[in-house]
Amino acid sequence: MAEHDLTSKMGCFLDRHLVFPLLEFLSVKEIYDEHELLKGKLDLLSNTNMVDFAMDVYKGLYPDEEVPTSLVEKRVEVVKELKDLQAQTEPIINCFSDPEFTAQVQSTRDGRQLFEYLERNHDIKPEMLDVLYKFAKFQYECGNYSGAAEYLYFYRALAPGGDTNSLNALWGKLASEILMQNWDTALEDLNRLKDVIESNTSAGTLQLLQERTWLIHWSLFVFFNHPKGRDLIIDLILYQPQYLNAIQTMCPHILRYLTTAVITNKRRRPVLKDLVKVIQQESYTYRDPITEFLECLYVNFDFDGAQKKLRECETVLLNDFFLVACRDDFIENARLFIFETFCRIHQCISISMLAEKLNMTPEEAERWIVNLIRNAKLDAKIDSKLGHVVMGVQAPSVYQQVIEKTKNLQYKTQVLAGNIEKKLTQDKGGYDAYGGSWNAYEPGFLAH
């Protein structure tokens, strides 16, 4: 279902290596023509050192042709440079096998002090640090993400504060951990990178905006795979003004992921009101079945529309790389939202009518409601004789009302800040693309 596919938008804010898993997913789902996807992969690979992979893709594209000489020659060059860099960095890498030095790495965070120790005891020269960074990035470009992560860790341990490559090294380390699916370590690197970005007082407004936008997109890999991720994405995006502003200004399509996280997170039900306000405000710039489902249900109280959007949501979820694993949780919670909202309005409703709204048989609907009541997920009771469900009435606590009013003030402040940001953007004529050594890639063949 290419209509709602976001890969082309996401790719603009991802390192090219992070785009590969998305393309593999699209290939399995058969959303696009396979030939076009293979051409896209080959284009992606053109600026990497994964020559063997590029050869395989080329053979898939052109099975009757010989592999181009340029690829064969590039492979020879890559192997030679890899050996050269390995030889140049061997002395500094071997230092991390020294127990005394390893103990110092664990006990101090002063890279300059550690490097002075290496200069005194192992005759390591300052220029070797740049070579170590180059070797780490070369390993990454070859697709050796475990090697890249290890050498970037070494580099960051030794790099002095303010080193020009430190920020790039953090991006590279995060990308490597994501591609190895080390979600706990990736979350640590994500938080570390966020702290560095937010503490950079010398960065301009536009640079910070772009870096936050990149961080939001990269974080999706972590948030939709880590056990705590669906809580963390809500805290990052909905309740940190600078990140909400980044979404409103640069990437409103991220609302799909925020909305899914809220719907599938039973403990965060109170944030629905704030989320719906954001969705309403941004509906003129972005909407899809997932955001429209909440609009139908909580803004328009259009239950037929919500039911229709829920069916569309299932297709969107199954064809979204980040959300496919959320499908069952989403459908279950979305049905509960429809049920609660409908019963809250009507107080008493026939099970047969409810079954129709939930796209179930009356027997399935009754069993579903009984299970909700039994598991204490719902304050309601069933009148078996009349075939009715009667909802209980719960008044919100004073404490909860105070919290919601406070959040409303915070939200209004965020909206005001976002409007100012947009006005500044229009006055400046838009944003220039920003890219570091870990560059984004725009897969144009997926543009709708």
UniProtKB/Swiss-Prot annotation:
Protein's organism: Nematostella vectensis (Starlet sea anemone)
Localization in the cell: Cytoplasm
A GO MF term: translation initiation factor activity
Designated name of the protein: Eukaryotic translation initiation factor 3 subunit E
HAMAP family reported in the protein's UniProt record: eIF3e
GO cellular component: eukaryotic 43S preinitiation complex; eukaryotic 48S preinitiation complex; eukaryotic translation initiation factor 3 complex; eukaryotic translation initiation factor 3 complex, eIF3e; nucleus
GO annotation terms (biological process): formation of cytoplasmic translation initiation complex; translational initiation
Oligomeric form and interacting partners: Component of the eukaryotic translation initiation factor 3 (eIF-3) complex.
Primary localisation category: cytoplasm
Job description of the protein: Component of the eukaryotic translation initiation factor 3 (eIF-3) complex, which is involved in protein synthesis of a specialized repertoire of mRNAs and, together with other initiation factors, stimulates binding of mRNA and methionyl-tRNAi to the 40S ribosome. The eIF-3 complex specifically targets and initiates translation of a subset of mRNAs involved in cell proliferation.
PANTHER family: EUKARYOTIC TRANSLATION INITIATION FACTOR 3 SUBUNIT E
Pfam families, A to Z: eIF3_N (PF09440), EIF3E_C (PF21357), PCI (PF01399)
Boundaries of every PCI domain copy: 225-396
Family membership: Belongs to the eIF-3 subunit E family.
Protein biosynthesis found in the keyword field: yes
Record key words, sorted: Cytoplasm, Initiation factor, Protein biosynthesis
